[in-house]
């Protein structure tokens, strides 16, 4: 199990457009991916779950990966987060 922590930099927060791109991107990975915001945890591969968090700007998030290819997944997700400006 590995994790990646980051702060949301988009002034609108984690809204539908980048969330959709991120969710679609992570579906390629076989490992289990959890997005954690405060005490809430959702499946990062679930669009409804991610949007249900209502993540504002400057929020601190954690992505937890568990299973096959977890290191590669987090490395690629970190790059994608930067690319999307989340």
Task: Name each model-derived stretch.
Residues 1, 47-48, 76:
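Detector for methionine-enriched segments
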Residues 1-5, 60-62:
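Intrinsic-disorder/low-complexity, polar/charged segments enriched in Ser/Thr/Lys/Arg/Asp/Glu/Gln
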Residues 52-86:
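C-terminal structural segments of small proteins and small subunits
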Residues 7-48, 52-56:
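Compact, glycine-rich, soluble single-domain proteins
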């Amino acid at each position: 199990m590995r994790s990646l922590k980051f702060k949301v930099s988009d002034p609108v927060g984690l809204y539908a457009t980048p969330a959709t791109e991120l969710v679609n991107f992570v579906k390629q990975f076989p490992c289990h991916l959890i997005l954690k915001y405060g005490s809430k945890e959702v499946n990062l591969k679930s669009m409804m779950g991610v949007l249900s968090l209502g993540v504002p700007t400057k929020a601190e998030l954690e992505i937890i990966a568990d299973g096959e290819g977890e290191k590669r997944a987090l490395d690629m997700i970190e790059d994608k987060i930067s690319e999307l400006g989340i």
